[in-house]
């Protein structure tokens, strides 16, 4: 396979070239204008950030992206799917409110904001890919219906995947709530009876008649009928239907790669990642710990696998910040250049396994050429 081209822009600015200008120049040089954008519904997949977390990509970048896409005739919209865990982004109403609090709205972002899997995370399409782990990933409908996919990725650590980049944003981020259950879980859901109030919503909406209320009006799952679709987890507002067992990091990354294939199947796509505010954990937390390395730059590519590998390599090569962060406290007199910082922080994770699987199933290549502009 030919080397993928990954384009890199540093963060140095001048009075005639600010960071937004540099991002636009990077995108154009990397070939975003070659996409069939005219009259296309173009999904800009971005993480709006859990309220309290300040490491997410600023809405200014999203607005510049939307305006650039519109200049090519596209109909862009910002989008994300609801979360599996209970929080401020587990349903569309709270999710949109959270996005607005963090600066993402039609005025500031210069385009509409759409929660792709609907009000309660149950609006999705199954995309058949014949995957080894996920035969038919459940993708949020607004993303499945989009003509073109653009991912804007904050590159940072992740406590289960090792790091979060393009594949994490695509594979996990575009999954419906039930899809996220398939990604995370190694078994069927269970009922935390102490939280169940007997509201009956899971019983009414189980497509497989696998749930009933017992004599104590607590939900019970018939595992001979349960297919592990996750609808009960998506619908329960009381943390009563929950994930039973979490999958390993390696299998999670395999599944993320396969979900990414489903998201991008038969669609033109393009990706940009920001190595800024590289926090040790994901933006789903309501806080962000201190950055572990200096801000490095922005990278863009048509190949999400090459993009993730290039970002990982740059972080590995970078020195650790000697400030009060999780790595500096343990390695006070070391610069850690050449060290796998994500594995040092999360030793039970294996991010490289996901990239290898993504390469194996044809999503992209880890063999890249870094082009500095």
In which residue ranges do the predicted regions lie?
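Extended, low-polarity segments enriched in aliphatic/aromatic residues
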Residues: 2-53, 57-61, 67, 72-80, ...
């Amino acid at each position: 396979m030919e080397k993928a081209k990954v384009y890199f822009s540093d963060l140095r600015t001048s009075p005639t070239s600010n960071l937004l200008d540099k991002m636009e120049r990077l995108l154009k040089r990397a070939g975003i204008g070659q996409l069939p954008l005219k009259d296309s519904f173009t999904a800009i997949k971005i993480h709006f950030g859990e309220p309290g977390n300040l490491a997410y990509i600023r809405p200014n970048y999203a607005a510049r992206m939307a305006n650039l896409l519109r200049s090519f005739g596209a109909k862009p919209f910002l989008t994300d799917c609801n979360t599996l865990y209970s929080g401020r982004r587990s349903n569309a109403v709270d999710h949109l409110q959270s996005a607005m609090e963090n600066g993402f709205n039609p005025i500031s972002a210069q385009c509409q904001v759409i929660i792709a899997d609907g009000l309660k995370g149950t609006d999705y399409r199954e995309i058949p890919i014949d995957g080894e782990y996920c035969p038919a990933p459940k993708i949020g409908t607004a993303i499945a219906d989009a003509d073109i996919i653009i991912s804007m990725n904050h590159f940072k650590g992740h406590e289960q995947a090792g790091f979060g980049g393009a594949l994490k944003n695509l594979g996990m981020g575009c999954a419906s709530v039930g899809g996220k259950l398939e990604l995370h879980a190694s078994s069927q859901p269970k009922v935390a009876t102490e939280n169940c109030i007997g509201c009956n919503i899971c019983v009414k909406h189980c497509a497989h008649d696998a749930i009933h209320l017992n004599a104590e009006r607590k939900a019970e799952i018939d595992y001979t009928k349960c297919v592990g679709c996750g609808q009960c987890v998506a619908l329960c507002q009381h943390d009563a239907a929950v994930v039973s067992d979490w999958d390993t990091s390696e299998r999670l990354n395999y599944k993320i790669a396969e979900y990414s294939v489903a998201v991008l199947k038969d669609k033109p796509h393009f990706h940009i990642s920001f190595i800024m505010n590289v926090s040790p954990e994901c933006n789903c937390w309501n806080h962000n710990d201190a950055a572990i390395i200096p801000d490095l730059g922005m990278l863009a590519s048509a190949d999400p696998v090459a993009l993730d590998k290039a970002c990982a390599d740059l972080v590995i090569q970078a020195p650790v910040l000697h400030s009060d962060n999780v790595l500096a406290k343990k390695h006070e007199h070391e610069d850690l250049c050449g060290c796998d910082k994500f594995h040092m922080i999360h030793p039970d994770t294996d991010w490289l396994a996901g990239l290898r699987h993504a390469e194996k199933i044809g999503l992209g290549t880890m063999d890249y050429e870094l082009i500095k502009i």
